[in-house]
């Protein structure tokens, strides 16, 4: 039996308690939630979580993510599929960018008012993840890069780290609610992370993240910032805000109950 824990780096009890902590699997005692506070970066927070927990499967989730009823059983089903496809898999995610640059999902995003991502028929190998939710197999022995700044692009970095070690990362049909706030434009902390990734993975560029293409020239950074400015009003109108209960969002997406009953459930969700 593989054991499961969910790790979250949170700086807001209000956001946490309105979203991730509302996920039924915690209230039902079917999974544990490990919290990290006051870390200077996502990498440091998540490495601390790895050191503080022992579960075979660690789910790194944002505090504004909601996991609908039965989500843990769907996770078990997806991991059984990827295990059958690649017994040495390292990472799995709810949303990622395929090797062909296709967006693999689906997830709900409140900031743009859409379900995003193509639903694949089987686990699909990816080059990057959206950081809203990343699943790691502890036996992969992966660690996050504590030299990486801030809170952006670590989903791309951990995938590239895995690939550099001969391991693979996948995304598949693992719905989640991302009750995220609208962001008007890329800020300086995002630019810092972009430059770091340019330097670190310069021999592997270009790389496509869910937000931007990382290229040697960096022209896509300037292009995206220009597009952000010119599309700000349109994108703001797409946002539904963050005041809707995540349970209601899950219901509207058709995800109120994701319970599935795999024949061989090897994931112990009681730990």
Where are the language model's segments positioned?
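Short, well-formed alpha-helical segments that are part of the catalytic scaffolds
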Residues: 12-27
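Glycine-rich, basic loop-to-helix element that forms the pyrophosphate-binding segment
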Residues: 39-53
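Short aromatic/hydrophobic "clamp" motif used to bind/position activated sugar donors
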Residues: 58
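The conserved acidic donor/metal-binding loop of glycosyltransferases
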Residues: 62-66
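Conserved donor NDP-sugar-binding/catalytic core segment of glycosyltransferases
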Residues: 70-107
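Short, flexible, basic/aromatic active-site loop/helix in glycosyltransferases
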Residues: 106-131, 141
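A short, conserved alpha-helix in the catalytic core of glycosyltransferases
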Residues: 127-141, 148-175
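Active-site donor/metal-binding and catalytic loop motifs
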Residues: 170-192, 196-200, 211-217
